[in-house]
């Protein structure tokens, strides 16, 4: 489905809409669409997983499916530490035999859940259905209190087998596998491999590889723990498998680097990696640089060609074939650059914002404060020759690199086949010209056909929407451009507690699910 309409409108909201005191256990900590987009899962700080099912194929509408307790609070007696029940991440597997499977994790334990429709049957007919008949005999022996004996009139011919009938259907969730006791530190990421047989889990210092069918054994593929912990200079912040090549995965660090690894080269992927890192002039370093440059989330584009990384102040788009600098750097909430001391005092500077690609690999979204989230339409475009580029305001951008080509031969070969189809699909009805001149490179990123309704003639390179109770009021708030401009105008009024950290983009259309404290908002361009 072409994803060239960016006229996002509010569709649904799940949760308490009134101004009530929000309990900490109700805060949503994970949001994830499945591969089809017909199912949506959320996890919260209380260890619960809530599933939603699409109820209307033409419009983006979902209904509640089921809820279950995925994790409970535990206590590590060896370390005297409490293990939170908070759901850190949820990942869907592909469905099999009318059952759905998903992985959920807290800080220490990963669980594989099977969600299926269960029939409840009751006994509708048996030998006592019609009751028991009694006969009264006149003989004095074997008599009852009323002077007669009691016997059931049941002949051999009248005996029946019990019959079951359909009573009800429920959605049941059962844990199929529990993967535990493999991480010393807190798990921050899980990622399912494209082979649908293995997945990885990452904590602060190690990354483990699991087989879905073997819960009691994992293989350590990355270990950055130094011999002397006083020499520790960085930690792992996120990890993800390549969406098409099952031998490739990447992980990010608190130093602002991304490392792409090939499991075919070595069993322990610590050293032989391709490192994506941007040079920072030491003159521009300050007290907060080390904190703000820490990458909180990384994502592959669905076609596997690009990488999006998010740190506190920027989103960076990388080409897997060019590791010396990003193709594009998008500045996020620039208003905070002069207020980093305030964010440090209230710990907001440590917030871990996510980043996400659209299903066609052309656009990205991320979150901010005041319940705002930003969508950047058509950041990645392609020409007829399938050489994808990133729209940028820097005319001197040169997306070429010859380093470490051996690790990406499989990606480049696949670009001409699988990626080529998606590139051609995206080129229909969209400006796909290569950025070659200063005029075109400085032009705003067009909003595609989404501008043909209220915002015709208005080109937008950033859409700012708000996941707040104002979204479902009856009052109209103007065009997309007007709403976006109003949401950008923060002034000095910033609510750091209203931060959009978790969200998911529908894989086949421009519909997004956004977690705002204890509410789940759905916006759609359909």
From Swiss-Prot:
Keywords: Cell cycle, Phosphoprotein, Repeat, WD repeat. The keyword Transmembrane helix does not apply. SMART domains: WD40. InterPro entries: PP2A_PR55, PP2A_PR55_CS, WD40/YVTN_repeat-like_dom_sf, WD40_repeat_dom_sf, WD40_rpt. The modification Phosphoserine is found at residue 124. One of its GO terms (biological process) is positive regulation of protein localization to membrane. Present with 8600 molecules/cell in log phase SD medium. Belongs to the phosphatase 2A regulatory subunit B family. This is Protein phosphatase PP2A regulatory subunit B. It comes from Saccharomyces cerevisiae (strain ATCC 204508 / S288c) (Baker's yeast). The lineage of its organism: Eukaryota, Fungi, Dikarya, Ascomycota, Saccharomycotina. The gene is CDC55.
């Amino acid at each position: 489905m072409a994803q060239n309409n960016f006229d996002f409108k509010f569709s649904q909201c799940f949760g308490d809409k009134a101004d009530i005191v929000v309990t900490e256990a109700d805060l949503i900590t994970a949001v994830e669409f499945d591969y089809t987009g017909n199912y949506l899962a959320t996890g919260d700080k209380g260890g619960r997983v809530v599933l939603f099912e699409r109820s209307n194929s033409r419009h983006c509408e979902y209904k509640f499916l089921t809820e279950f307790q995925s994790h409970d609070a535990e206590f590590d007696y060896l370390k005297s530490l409490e293990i939170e029940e908070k759901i850190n991440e949820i990942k869907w597997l592909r469905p099999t035999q009318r059952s759905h499977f998903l992985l959920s994790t807290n800080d220490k334990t990963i669980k594989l859940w099977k969600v299926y429709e269960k029939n409840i049957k009751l006994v509708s007919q048996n030998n006592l259905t019609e009751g028991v008949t009694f006969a009264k005999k006149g003989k004095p022996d074997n008599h009852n209190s009323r002077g007669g004996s009691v016997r059931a009139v049941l002949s051999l011919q009248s005996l029946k087998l019990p019959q079951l009938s359909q009573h009800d259907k429920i959605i049941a969730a059962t844990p199929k596998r529990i993967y535990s006791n493999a991480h010393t530190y807190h798990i921050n990421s899980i990622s399912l491999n494209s082979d649908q047989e293995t997945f990885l889990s990452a904590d602060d210092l190690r990354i483990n590889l699991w087989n879905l069918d073997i819960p009691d054994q994992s293989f350590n593929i990355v270990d950055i723990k130094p011999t002397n912990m006083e020499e520790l200079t960085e930690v792992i912040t996120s990890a993800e498998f390549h969406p098409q090549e099952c031998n490739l995965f990447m992980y990010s660090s608190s130093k602002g680097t991304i490392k792409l690894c090939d499991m075919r080269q070595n069993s322990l992927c610590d050293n032989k990696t391709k490192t994506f890192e941007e040079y920072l002039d030491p003159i521009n370093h300050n007290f907060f640089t080390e904190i703000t440059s820490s990458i909180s989330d990384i994502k592959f584009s669905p076609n596997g060609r690009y990488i999006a990384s998010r740190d506190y102040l920027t989103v960076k788009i990388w080409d897997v074939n060019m590791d010396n600098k990003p193709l594009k750097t998008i500045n996020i909430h620039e208003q905070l650059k002069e207020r980093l001391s305030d964010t440090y005092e209230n710990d907001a500077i440590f917030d871990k914002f996510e980043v996400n690609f659209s299903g066609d690999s052309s656009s990205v979204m991320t979150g901010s404060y005041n319940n705002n989230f930003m969508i950047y339409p058509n950041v990645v475009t392609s020409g007829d020759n399938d050489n994808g580029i990133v729209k940028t305001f820097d005319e001197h951008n040169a997306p070429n690199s010859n380093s470490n080509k051996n690790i990406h031969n499989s990606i480049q070969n696949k670009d001409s086949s699988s990626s080529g189809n998606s590139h051609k699909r995206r080129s229909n009805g969209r400006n796909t010209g290569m950025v070659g001149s200063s005029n075109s490179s400085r032009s705003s990123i067009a909003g595609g056909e989404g501008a043909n309704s209220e915002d015709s003639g208005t080109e937008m390179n950033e859409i700012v929407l708000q996941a707040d109770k104002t979204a479902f009021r009856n009052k109209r708030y103007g065009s997309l451009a007007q709403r976006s401009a109003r949401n950008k105008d923060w002034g000095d009024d910033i609510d750091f507690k209203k931060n959009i950290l978790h969200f998911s983009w529908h894989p086949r259309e421009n519909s997004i699910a956004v977690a705002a404290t204890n509410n789940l908002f759905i916006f759609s361009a359909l």
